[in-house]
Amino acid sequence: MRILGINAVFHDPAAALVVDGRVVAAAEEERFSRRKHGKRPVPFSAWEQPERAARWCLEQGGIDVTDLDAVGYSYDPSLVDHNAEGLDPAWEELRTTYASRAPYFLESALPGLDPDIVHFVRHHVAHAASTGLAAPFRDSAVMVADGRGENISYLAGEYRDGKLLECATQSLPHSLGLLYEDLTEHLGFARSSDEYKVMALASYGRPRFEPEFRELVRTTGDGGFRTDPVDWAAFAPRRTGGFGQEHADLAATVQKRLEDVLLELARWLREQTGQSRLTLAGGTALNCVANSRLHREGPFEEIWVQPASGDSGTALGAALHLAAEAGEPIEPMPGADLGRGWTDDELRGWLDRAGVRYERPDDVADTVADALADNRIVAWFQGRAEFGPRALGHRSLLAHPGHKANLERLNDVKGREQFRPVAPMVLAERAAEIFGGGPLPSPYMLFVHDVDPKWTDRIPAVTHVDGTARIQTVDAAEKPLLARMLRAFADRTGLPVVVNTSLNTAGRPMVDDPRDALECFGSSPVDLLAIGPFVVRRP
């Protein structure tokens, strides 16, 4: 079957194509529109469809829209209770009205599409399928926690032989994701966008409000939880300027309480299912600190997290769910590089049209290693783009990890807060000697690891204030060019580690196409652009 998956209702609109149980393509609309998160997460944007991402997915698969067997839409408007506690009836009615007309909006966006083949898939089921069906093992327990779907904020269950068996759900208004979003907004950041900044800030605080939050956020013993309304100003004033210690302490408290609740839920789920493996999705699964506590202290032997755990991943999950429901065997997700890519000839054409001076060295990996060893900042544009929020060696900014000032340099390039860390990529075969306390390999930057004390002074740019790092391990069999660059850098410096952060500037989505890469290179203090086999140097 040829199945297109669509996410469109809240934020991070995306499309994915699954053919005969195999993931062919997946992309977020923001990479095409250049609008961060694709659109605003408000009810009157629910009609907008990821039409450019969808058209590209079909093109990548060589499929005409009339050849599709089904379209999975990751939201079921029939399940929404407009009068549920905590929801605004007028806003919910508007959102569900738009969502219910999605087949016709898609027909307009993709001429030739039969609206009768569009199927509504529950939001949390789509999240669950994106991880439980895409994981490298067939059976697992599954946990999905986010802000909200139609009428719930959490689903727990298990996959057995490709079928989802639900064990527990949590109805609104109780929501771990919305709790974290509320905190994000109180701390002066953008909700449904900047929650990762709160996670970083938490490392600078201590959870001194924990007794109060144990009462406000608690499990119920049956696989659910309660989140009571929080008077945030009672703990720290709403941030409108600089940060105070109370802001960091509040972030640390909520982060700790989130982790504790997830651990309790995981232990309950293990007892219910007997599964030894856990798969995670939903926006909360992008909290790599919480994931790491689940790995260290939780009851599961192995944890796999969907790299696109946010709402964009529900496009993939909706398509996989329909494929599994049709009885098709599902192949594990081949990796996160599911987006657009260009041939060498196409890249040369872009460079020629841009009128920039470029060269084709014998080995771009060696050239980049030389530049990094000389403490240059490199923009790295290679292969197909990543699906999800993490830069995983396809659209990256790279730097030398041995110079602490590079953290500030990169944060300045990207317009980021200085308290935020940058991440290391490391050769998979060398990871265990440098990083501990987390799962290895760790190819998707979804866990934090402790930096061995012998290495903290050697790689200060990637060592966070709490002595951890969110690593990406690089396997030469899966990413030969990236591994070759890392080995060349290690030969020159003795460090099998390179700083890796996403290739973008402040407020912009990650670079996707060659035009984006050239624009980013030209508008930021980056020394070298490695684009396919070509190199562009700063004049």
Where in the sequence are the language-model features?
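Extreme N-terminal starter segment of soluble prokaryotic enzymes
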Residues: 1-4
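Phosphate/ATP-binding catalytic cores across multiple sugar-kinase/actin-like superfamilies
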Residues: 253-278
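Short glycine/proline-rich turn/loop motifs
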Residues: 239-247
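N-terminal phosphate-binding loop and adjacent alpha-helix
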Residues: 32-63, 262
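Flexible beta->alpha loop and helix N-cap segments adjacent to enzyme active/binding sites
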Residues: 7-36, 41-45, 66, 84, ...
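Phosphate/pyrophosphate-binding loops at sites that engage ATP/ADP/AMP, CoA/4′-phosphopantetheine
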Residues: 53-69, 109-110, 265-274
